[in-house]
Structures are given as C-alpha cells and as structure tokens.
Amino acid sequence: MANKDYYEVLGLEKGASDDEIKKAFRKLAIKYHPDKNRGNKEAEEKFKEINEAYQVLSDPDKKANYDRFGTADFNGGGGFGDFSGGFGDFGDLGDIFNSFFGGGFSGGSSRARKDAPQRGNDMEYSISLTFEEAVFGVEKSINITRSENCETCGGTGAKKGTSPKTCDKCGGTGTIRVQRNTPLGSFVTQSSCDKCGGRGTIISDPCHECHGAGHVRKKRKISVKIPAGVDTGNVIPLRGQGEHGKNGGPAGDLYISIKVTPHKKFKREGFDIYIDTHISFPKAALGTDMTVPTIDGDVKYTIPAGTQSGTVFRLKGKGVQRVNGGGRGNQYVKVIVDTPKALNDKQREALKMFMEASGEAKSEKKSGFKRFFE
C-alpha cells in the first residue's frame, strides 16, 4: 500500500490518538470483513488496507517512524502479521467476530460446557375451578409428566458402578481449537467437540434405564393448594416442581393457570359480587323485607318504600376474600321492579282506584289523540 495515507485509510486526521485509531479500526474491520462480504474483492482489498494501516498506527515505534518519514520501514514493508493470538486487545471485538466465523476466537469469551449445571425447564398447567372453589379456596390434585433425574444412575447417564470418562479429544473442555488461515493470517477458533458432543465426558457403558441421557420422563401426582379469592387469569407458581435440572442444576417451576367457570346467579368483578333481584310494583312502592342470596348464604334485607327499578344496594363485606389479605369485597344488589303483564279483574280495579287516588284517571280521559285534534 505504497504512497497511501494510513490516517486517510482509517478516516482519521494526522496525529489521532491511540483510542481514536482503535475505534476507527474496529468500525471499518467489521464493515469490510471478508466473511461479511463473501465474493467481494473490493471489500477484501479494503480490509487488507485497513489492517496494514492499523498495524502501523497501533505500534508506537512504527507510528513515530511513519509520522516522521512517511514510511513505517518495518521488515517486509507490509504484511498482516499473525492473528493467532486472538483479539484480546480489542475488548469485545472478538465477540463481534465470533458471529462471522461461527466460533469463539482465542482470547474471547469461552463457551459454556454442556456438562455444566443447567436449570430445569419451567412447566405450565391449566386448571378449571367452580365459582365456589375460586371464592373459598380448594386443594386439588393434578397429574403431570415431567423430566426427572434418573434414579438408577443418579443423573450421570452411566451404568451403576461406573462413571463418565474424560473425553480424550478435548481433554474434558468440551471444545476444540481450530486454526483457520485467511488473507489476514491465522485465526484460532473454538467449536464444540464432535466426539463428546460438547459435554467433555464420554459414557462408555450407558445406564440401561435412561440409555445414557441421565434423565427420564415420569408421571407425578401433585397436590395444589388454591387460595381463596383467585380468579380467571391468575397464576400460582409452584417453585421447584418443574422439570429437574441437569448436571446438578436446580429444578424449574410449575405454573398453575386458573380458569373459573361462571356462576348462574352471581357475577364477579374483581373482589365484588353483583346480583339482580326482582320485586313487584306494590313491594317497591310500599317497601318490603326480602331474602337476598350471598356466597355465605341467604340474608335478610329491607327494601325501603319508593325504591325505583335499577336501584343498587350495597352489602358491605359480602364479596370475595382478597387473595393477599385486606378483607373482603362487597356484594351489590340491583333491584328490578316487575310490571305485571296480565291482570285479573280485582287487580285491574285496584289499580284504577290507585290511579284515581293519584289524580291520574281524570287527566288520562282528557288526554290522547282525540283531545289533541279537537
């Protein structure tokens, strides 16, 4: 790259700081990396220029020589060096390059071995409750099938009396290092060991119960305590009742999803209960004592005289128990006044007398369409 301005290649002004040089290189190296621009010769050449410029400007002696004489004058007059030492000096650049190469660069973050402790998977179970069960609480038994550690081998996967052996290919690390030659030099990457599958151990004599897996499917009956006050959409967590962990890892959790069947009479909103009650016109007018159903049983309630249809009365503390404490909600009673559709002679006569006593009968005779057109 004779007669080219290294600062210009990296998009910098002469005299740029080490930090500015490093940041510029990171940005351009990712943009023009060959694995990100396969088949693009122009990008490949640009990447070579970027690396050559960085090798000069990142080295204090070469940079000083270049700034003074316009040439780095280092052995070979160019080249790209050996990158087998990894990208440790570039912070997280090695992690970014991992996505290009599909493996870990030496000096970068290491992969987790498959024989490391792993938390078990969480599970979900939906349970249906009656209105009463949700309101008062209940204990239910459910049947689930989950993955558990094999009792025969203790979860090792090896036949009883034996144990897994360290993989002779990866030395128990679960990964192997592979050197790749690129236009930039040699890159060392890590990949999962193909002999042990990344576990770091090999089972020569597998357990006859789990066939080397270390875990088996088991059916279990679990008792679930449903607290009073739950409603549709609530979820109850059962810690540690999910699938067992692997390699000594903790078990997952079991989440119980609640669905409540609607009641024929009561309607629930939050922790309050709503109910409609029907009374006759005379009772609404004169007032009456009546029996109102609640979740605790029937209670006596006095409907005051002159109650209009649609009036709502509150029965304090007759609602649902709050799950996390704080007392109970209320029950609201909506009064619906029924108008009779069929009257016998006695009822009709009584209503006429009521109308006359109310001063409505005479007014009614003089009203209507005939009077309107007179």
UniProtKB/Swiss-Prot annotation:
InterPro entries in UniProt: DnaJ, DnaJ_C, DnaJ_domain, DnaJ_domain_CS, HSP40/DnaJ_pept-bd, HSP_DnaJ_Cys-rich_dom, HSP_DnaJ_Cys-rich_dom_sf, J_dom_sf
Task: Locate the residues binding Zn(2+) 1.
Answer: 150, 153, 207, 210
Classification via PROSITE patterns: DNAJ_1 (PS00636), DNAJ_2 (PS50076), ZF_CR (PS51188)
Using the UniProt record, give the first listed, main subcellular location: cytoplasm
Q: Name one GO molecular function term.
A: unfolded protein binding
Q: May I have one GO cellular component term? A: cytoplasm
Q: What induces it?
A: By heat shock.
Q: How is the cofactor bound?
A: Binds 2 Zn(2+) ions per monomer.
GO terms classed as biological process: chaperone cofactor-dependent protein refolding; DNA replication; protein refolding; response to heat
User: Which UniProt key words apply to this protein?
Assistant: Chaperone, Cytoplasm, DNA replication, Metal-binding, Repeat, Stress response, Zinc, Zinc-finger
Q: Specify whether Ligase is a keyword of the entry.
A: no
Do the record's keywords include Zinc-finger? yes
Per-repeat ranges for CXXCXGXG motif? 150-157, 167-174, 193-200, 207-214
Explain the purpose of this protein: Participates actively in the response to hyperosmotic and heat shock by preventing the aggregation of stress-denatured proteins and by disaggregating proteins, also in an autonomous, DnaK-independent fashion. Unfolded proteins bind initially to DnaJ; upon interaction with the DnaJ-bound protein, DnaK hydrolyzes its bound ATP, resulting in the formation of a stable complex. GrpE releases ADP from DnaK; ATP binding to DnaK triggers the release of the substrate protein, thus completing the reaction cycle.
| Free-text note on domains in this protein's UniProt record | The J domain is necessary and sufficient to stimulate DnaK ATPase activity. Zinc center 1 plays an important role in the autonomous, DnaK-independent chaperone activity of DnaJ. Zinc center 2 is essential for interaction with DnaK and for DnaJ activity.
Q: Which family does it belong to?
A: Belongs to the DnaJ family.
Q: How does it assemble?
A: Homodimer.
Q: What is this protein called?
A: Chaperone protein DnaJ
Annotated source species: Clostridium acetobutylicum (strain ATCC 824 / DSM 792 / JCM 1419 / IAM 19013 / LMG 5710 / NBRC 13948 / NRRL B-527 / VKM B-1787 / 2291 / W)
